[in-house]
Amino acid sequence: MTLIMIGVDLVKIERLENKSDHFVRKILSLDEYELYQKTKAKAIFLATRWAIKEALFKADNQHFCFKKINITKKDNVYKFDGFAISVSSEKEYVIAFVQKIGVACHRD
């Protein structure tokens, strides 16, 4: 049997509106924080990163410190080494689905 490591997180965007800079710096990497400072849609940016990082943690408990997880986005695809990430948003929610890639754990 192959073990599939997945994580899912659903976030209500309004929960991350008007967060203090101290809070934001605790969960975003330095690169993410620079992007956050430039965006007008701060709550959506923060909710998306939060959902992805929570889903990563649920898929693989090795990632404890959100600030050390740097999520990149290229060609509208979110990336973090070793994981496939899917994100969707609708009105007031963001959902992230994460699967660890290359896991070959077998149980007898």
Curated annotation (Swiss-Prot):
Taxonomic superkingdom: Bacteria
EC class of the enzyme, as a word: transferase
Gene Ontology molecular-function annotations: holo-[acyl-carrier-protein] synthase activity; magnesium ion binding
Cellular localization per UniProt: Cytoplasm
GO cellular component, as recorded: cytoplasm
Coiled coil: none
Binding annotation for Mg(2+): D9, E54
Enzyme Commission no: 2.7.8.7
Major place of residence: cytoplasm
Gene Ontology BP annotations: fatty acid biosynthetic process
UniProt keyword list: Cytoplasm, Fatty acid biosynthesis, Fatty acid metabolism, Lipid biosynthesis, Lipid metabolism, Magnesium, Metal-binding, Transferase
The reaction(s) this protein catalyses: apo-[ACP] + CoA = holo-[ACP] + adenosine 3',5'-bisphosphate + H(+)
Required cofactor names: Mg(2+)
NCBIfam families linked: pantethn_trn
Listed HAMAP family: AcpS (MF_00101)
Role according to the record: Transfers the 4'-phosphopantetheine moiety from coenzyme A to a Ser of acyl-carrier-protein.
Family indicated by similarity: Belongs to the P-Pant transferase superfamily. AcpS family.
Name of the protein in its database record: Holo-[acyl-carrier-protein] synthase
The species this protein was found in: Mycoplasmopsis pulmonis (strain UAB CTIP) (Mycoplasma pulmonis)
Species classification: Bacteria, Bacillati, Mycoplasmatota, Mycoplasmoidales, Metamycoplasmataceae
